[in-house]
């Protein structure tokens, strides 16, 4: 027997070190992980056997067995699934193969208490065995192959892989050599209870050997949970299925179990988590809903079963209308799958709309966790934009709470027809922005957008139910203007611009190319000035984001709006009327201040500092 000794990847070593020294109280999850892996192995072979029946020749009844050998201090888990060859053992057990495990590593903080909490949150598969075992032996034979291989490790940095002449049928056997301090897991009654609690939803029969090791007792019903009538499933069974499926420690917030009958037949058992999922904004944006066809697991990767913006969903979809032998490639552009996706999307958005109306406090928590992902759908080419906007909520500047667009519209001031928003990084900073002081003074609400995605979706969705969605940074906002007064106000605006032409020309002449235009503001009430952009221009925050991402090279010149009622601006204007044009430093300081308030860079920080010092010096002398 040739034996090779290998070192674990550094990443695996980190996980094993945490498992071995774990203080995590719920160590029994190792059985959940190993049973889940065994079930997956059976599901994979069941799928492959649809196109190659020889893979299951002589043994087509899938099963998992669990046995306790108390005398030798061992727990033995056996399945007759796909099995592994030498390369599989090295790849699956010696390296990081699962993105969830990689994400687990990234989340480690170095704080042992917090890191042990993560074990339950992520589920780290096979490696959790080392929480209770000081040695693990894996014997496996891959379906369709003759060779048997043995993998063994004490979890201390190295493992061995060897060929074996052992008589062994297809599948995998895992022997856990239980630590002395964890010998309570060798108690038949306790282990039987653990296996039963984690296995009832597993579609593969799970058998438990009696204490004599002779008779097998089936512990689970071996029927997929989603195939049972809802009336026969308890809330606890739903919760356990969700936790096992999702490697989660939280309970689901919403459970959706539906059987769709008609032109397209499918069953869905879907969950919305109550806590934020760790991989929600992972670059690959993976979706975590498993596709089954007639109870046979097909895939949970690279299939367009749910839209990306609903990737927080967990669960299964089981179709009756797709052929079992369909290739994963064929699933990419499949009309039946597209109809299932549309039906699920409609159902989920409908459920969210109902929750938003019935349980606003709970919905606020959901939105804090998943609102950012949901709004990504507003940037996609989908027919669901209005339905998505119906379930969106935003921070109200006027009422300091989360409200929907429909609530915003219901509270329109007389003559108002536009939905106003302001985007930025921090809601508290936005509340003190000059951009919205005039609107708020007239009790016109402004929605505060603080997610990066907000700057993108507003470029795709300029209206909601015929009402324009408009940034408060736009130049043509007049807080006094109403529908009934618009004609008169337009005349007044022209008169105001003419009256203050001396002022605006002076600012433009002083600032030159730093500004595009200088205008008299119709939205400022106390601040001296603010930056603004025209309706045709890119939003200020969006432009800044694209510069940071190196999508565009330089910032464009903005408009500068002046408040003639402000004492500083009034003083400059009066000086101009008296033919005093010695306020250039003050004009530059006002512009720099407007840039700072808008998060824009100051062109010359040295000059800005000098101007500020000069003004302070004059004030105190």
Curated annotation (Swiss-Prot):
Compartments reported by the entry: Cytoplasm
InterPro entries in the cross-refs: HATPase_C_sf (IPR036890), Heat_shock_protein_90_CS (IPR019805), HSP90_C (IPR037196), Hsp90_fam (IPR001404), Hsp90_N (IPR020575), Ribosomal_Su5_D2-typ_SF (IPR020568)
PROSITE patterns according to UniProt: HSP90
Region spans: B: 329-544
Region entry C, spans: 545-621
Chief location category: cytoplasm
Gene Ontology terms: cellular component: cytoplasm
Positions of region (A): 1-328
Highest taxon above the source species: Bacteria
Keywords: ATP-binding, Chaperone, Cytoplasm, Nucleotide-binding, Stress response
Region (Disordered): 475-494
Molecular function in Gene Ontology: ATP binding; ATP hydrolysis activity; ATP-dependent protein folding chaperone; unfolded protein binding
Signal sequence residues: none
Keyword match Magnesium: no
Purpose: Molecular chaperone. Has ATPase activity.
Quaternary organization: Homodimer.
Similarity comment text for this entry: Belongs to the heat shock protein 90 family.
Protein's name in the database: Chaperone protein HtpG
Organism: Rickettsia rickettsii (strain Sheila Smith)
């Amino acid at each position: 027997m040739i034996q090779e000794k290998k070192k674990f990847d550094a990443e695996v070593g980190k996980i094993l070190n945490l498992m071995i020294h774990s203080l995590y109280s719920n160590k029994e999850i190792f059985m959940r992980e190993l049973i889940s892996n065994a079930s997956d192995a059976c599901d994979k072979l069941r799928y492959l056997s649809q196109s190659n029946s020889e893979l299951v020749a002589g043994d087509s009844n899938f099963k998992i067995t669990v046995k306790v050998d108390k005398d030798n201090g061992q727990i033995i888990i056996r399945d007759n699934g796909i099995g592994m060859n030498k390369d599989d053992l090295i790849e699956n057990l010696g390296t990081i193969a699962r993105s969830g495990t990689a994400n687990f590593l990234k989340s480690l903080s170095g704080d042992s208490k917090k890191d042990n909490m993560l074990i339950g949150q992520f589920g780290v598969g096979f490696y959790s065995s080392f929480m209770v075992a000081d040695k693990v032996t894996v014997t496996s034979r891959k379906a369709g192959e003759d060779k048997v291989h043995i993998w063994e490790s004490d979890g201390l940095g190295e493992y061995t892989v060897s060929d074996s002449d052992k008589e062994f049928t297809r599948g995998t056997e895992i022997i856990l050599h239980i630590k002395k301090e964890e010998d309570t897991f060798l108690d038949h009654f306790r282990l039987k209870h653990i296996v039963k609690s984690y296995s009832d939803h597993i579609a593969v029969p799970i058998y438990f050997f009696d204490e004599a090791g002779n008779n097998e007792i089936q512990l689970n019903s071996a029927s997929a949970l989603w195939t049972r009538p809802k009336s026969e499933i308890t809330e606890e069974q739903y919760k356990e299925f969700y936790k096992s499926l999702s490697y989660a420690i939280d309970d689901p917030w919403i459970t959706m179990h539906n059987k769709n009958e008609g032109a397209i037949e499918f069953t869905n058992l879907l969950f919305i988590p109550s806590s934020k999922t760790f991989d929600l904004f992972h670059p690959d944006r993976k979706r975590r809903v498993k596709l089954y066809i007639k109870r046979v697991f097909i895939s949970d990767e690279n299939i367009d079963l749910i839209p990306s913006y609903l990737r927080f969903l967990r669960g299964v979809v089981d179709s009756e209308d797709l052929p079992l032998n369909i290739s994963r490639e064929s699933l990419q552009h499949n009309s039946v799958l597209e109809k299932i996706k549309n039906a699920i999307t409609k159902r989920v958005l409908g459920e969210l709309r109902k929750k938003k109306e019935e349980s606003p406090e709970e919905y606020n928590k959901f939105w804090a966790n998943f609102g950012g992902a949901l709004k990504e759908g507003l940037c996609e080419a989908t027919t669901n934009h209005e339905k998505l906007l119906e379930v969106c909520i935003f921070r109200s500047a006027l009422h300091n709470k989360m409200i929907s667009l429909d609530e915003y519209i219901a509270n329109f001031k007389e003559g108002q027809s536009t939905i106003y928003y302001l985007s930025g990084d921090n809601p508290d900073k936005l509340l003190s922005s000059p951009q919205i002081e005039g609107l708020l003074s007239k009790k016109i609400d402004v929605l505060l957008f603080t997610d990066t995605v907000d700057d993108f979706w507003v470029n795709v969705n300029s209206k909601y139910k015929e009402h324009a969605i408009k940034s408060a940074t736009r130049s043509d906002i007049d807080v006094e203007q109403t529908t009934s007064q618009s004609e008169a106000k337009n005349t007044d605006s022209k008169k105001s611009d003419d009256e203050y032409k001396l002022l605006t020309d002076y600012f433009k002449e002083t600032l030159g190319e730093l500004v595009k235009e200088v205008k008299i503001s119709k939205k400022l009430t106390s601040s001296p000035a603010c930056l603004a952009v025209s309706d045709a221009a890119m939003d200020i925050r969006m432009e800044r984001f694209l510069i940071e991402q190196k999508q565009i090279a330089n910032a464009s010149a903005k408009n500068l709006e002046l408040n003639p009622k402000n004492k500083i601006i009034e003083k400059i204007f009066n000086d101009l009327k008296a033919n005093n044009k010695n306020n250039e430093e003050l004009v530059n300081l006002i512009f720099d201040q407007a840039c700072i308030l808008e998060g824009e860079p100051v062109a010359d920080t040295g000059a800005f500092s000098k101007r500020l010092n000069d003004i302070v010096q004059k004030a105190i002398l």
